[in-house]
Amino acid sequence: MKKILLAMLFGAMTLTSFAEGKLKVVAAYGGKEKIFQQFSKDTGIEVDFIDMSSGEVLSKLQAEKGKPSADVWFGGGLDSFISAKNKGLLEKYISPEMEEVPLKYRDKDGYWSGVSLVLVGFMVNNEILEDRGLEAPKTWADLAKEEYRDEVIMANPAISGTNYAMVSNLIQEMGDEKAWAYFEELNKNVPFLAKRGGEPPMKVVTGEFGVAVIPMSGEFILLEEKYPVTTYYPEDMIPWVPAGMAIFKNAENLDSAKKFIDWALSEKGQTVIRDEDPRAMVRNGIATPDVVKKIDMDKLINIDIDVLGNDREKVLNEWNKRFGNKAK
């Protein structure tokens, strides 16, 4: 039903007459409504958007066969952006603002850029763990311990770019054999895989699960102020990936799309985006917000972004072969 609804929404977008000064966006980013409102205020360009995870966007792009129903892809896991580039589904655009973005956070050929950094961490429900006599897991090894059987929730990496980034990071850090052995143990604690990256933290908030693997953005960290939950980075190693953005090949509103990329990478745009969903940003000189917990940069896994993207199909095929029965 949800897929049908998404298709209907996109169909409605396609049938609508979009004049100059409009922009159609698929987005997987916290605070997007206010971000787009500020962009519209600054540029006069009206934004129509729909929320969709990165894996869903990639599948839809391929099905549209060069006739995209949107102009810009904003947010989501970088693996899908790299796959889309390799399949010829993205428009090359080197924004002048990219001079202030380190090369490790953007495509050297100009097909995508990072917006912010997504780090992967844990969220625990303190009351649930206390009731069950459990300590909060401190490391990835802890998370796979038998004591957390059926207590861990995480998103399906085939759909959630954040969770695919976690899988790819750990494979790159541990090596294939050790990583897949680890995932076998971890998945014994995971009764099912959620469809979206934002679903696991909410299931911990409501007490359905004691522990979640989450993207460590302000959107979820701020839940600590309202609920008995704690968010934190693993003590052993921190998976990470840039949240991407790109223009679709054959975008109808290309000029508006380019203006959005310029704005989102500008000092003004990066500040607005950071303030609406606090994260570490990609542009040089943009301060990390206080709400984002202190990051031990030495704990970030040393990853190859190209490997993360180019190995996506191989990694997900192996994941689905082993754990596909857990997909929700």
Where do the PLM segments sit?
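A ligand-binding cleft/hinge motif common to bilobed small-molecule-binding domains
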Residues: D79-S83, V205, G210-P228, D277
